Curated annotation (Swiss-Prot):
It comes from Ruegeria sp. (strain TM1040) (Silicibacter sp.). It comes from the Bacteria. Belongs to the complex I 30 kDa subunit family. NDH-1 is composed of 14 different subunits. Subunits NuoB, C, D, E, F, and G constitute the peripheral sector of the complex. One of its GO terms (molecular function) is NADH dehydrogenase (ubiquinone) activity. InterPro entries: NADH_DH_suC, NADH_quin_OxRdtase_su_C/D-like, NADH_UbQ_OxRdtase_30kDa_su, NADH_UbQ_OxRdtase_CS. This is NADH-quinone oxidoreductase subunit C. It is a peripheral membrane protein. It is found in: Cell inner membrane. NCBIfam families: NuoC_fam (TIGR01961), PRK06074.1-5 (NF004733). Its EC number is 7.1.1.-. The gene is nuoC. Its main location: membrane.
Length: 201
């Protein structure tokens, strides 16, 4: 299996060198790092090439790396039922970059790209209807970004007196604690109640 994926990686790199930045194999799947501008062309090639035949788009998602200059990885998961292989394409983009849509190659990408836009704020050029999919029309921010507050900005509830849905600022029962997610986690300096292991030392 690994040998077949290695052969496939070499073939794709040889046939489309302008698209492939690098590739590796992890968890039984071929991972290819792609230039964002070339993603649509590479996906089309992978669909029609007889050695590939990745005709099924399984998913499009993104990963947020706030410490990087190219903050997001847009990740495409493709399946070849003919070759019984999976492939993962990764395109690293800055926050303000736009990624070409692949709706013309895989119509099912329509909702996947809308979800990525809604959750991460990544824009897709050439998308026929790029609007929010999972959040409300007036929603502020993008919930899967790591800098989005866990409480959100507003809460929604039905007001019986007004007979309509109302938006209100978030009111917390306890004071909001801001955590620095970029720092390594450190435990308490003191022994916690009920921690018999520490007392036995």
């Amino acid at each position: 299996m690994i040998e077949a994926l290695q052969d496939l990686g070499h073939q794709i790199e040889a046939k489309r060198p302008e698209c492939v930045l690098s590739w590796d194999i992890a968890h039984g799947e071929l991972n290819i790092d792609v230039k964002p501008a070339n993603i649509a062309g590479l996906v089309e090639f992978l669909r029609v090439d007889s050695a590939c035949r990745f005709s099924t788009l399984v998913d499009i998602t993104a990963v947020d790396y706030p410490e990087r200059t190219k903050r997001f990885d847009v990740v495409y998961h493709l399946l070849s039922m003919y070759q019984n292989q999976r492939i993962r394409l990764r395109a690293a983009v800055r926050e303000e970059d736009m990624v070409p849509s692949i709706v013309d190659v895989h119509p099912s990408a329509n909702w996947f790209e809308r979800e990525v836009f809604d959750m991460f704020g990544i824009l897709f050029t050439g998308h026929p209807d790029l609007r929010r999919l999972l959040t409300d029309y007036g929603f502020r921010g993008h919930p899967l970004r790591k800098d989005f507050p866990t409480t959100g900005y507003t809460e929604v509830r039905y007001d019986e007196a007004q007979k309509r849905v109302v938006y209100e600022p978030v009111k917390l029962v306890q004071e909001y604690r801001q955590f620095d997610f970029m720092s390594p986690w450190e435990g308490a300096e003191y022994i916690l109640p009920g921690d018999e292991k520490e007392i036995a030392k």
